[in-house]
A protein has these predicted regions:
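Short aromatic-glycine-(Arg/Gly/Cys) micro-motifs in beta-strand/loop hairpins
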Residues: 1-17
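Polar/charged side chains located within well-ordered beta-strands of beta-rich proteins
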Residues: 6-8, 31, 35
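Generic structural motif
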Residues: 11, 24, 54-57
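A short, exposed loop/beta-hairpin motif centered on an aromatic-Gly-Thr core
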Residues: 13-29
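Short, mixed-charge low-complexity intrinsically disordered segments
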Residues: 35-68
């Protein structure tokens, strides 16, 4: 099973927000939203939106919003 994880990470590397789901289209849409919601100032200071995959719910960060 592929699980898609969307993360917003602050300049110090801390996870600011995280949403996980099994639907690739939903994950891509979420990632686009995460990217659009970062301001130019945030991006310049090192904020990033990251989309990655894992194979198990055990690999999803504990504070993630998990969508089935």
């Amino acid at each position: 099973m592929t699980i898609w994880i969307n993360e917003q990470i602050d300049p110090s590397g801390l996870l600011y927000s995280c949403i996980a789901c099994c639907n690739e289209t939903q994950a891509q849409n979420c990632h686009a939203s995460f990217e659009q919601n970062l301001t130019a100032e945030q991006k310049a200071s090192g904020w990033v939106a990251r989309l990655r995959t894992v194979n198990s719910w055990d690999e999803v960060p504990v504070n993630a919003l998990k969508l089935d």
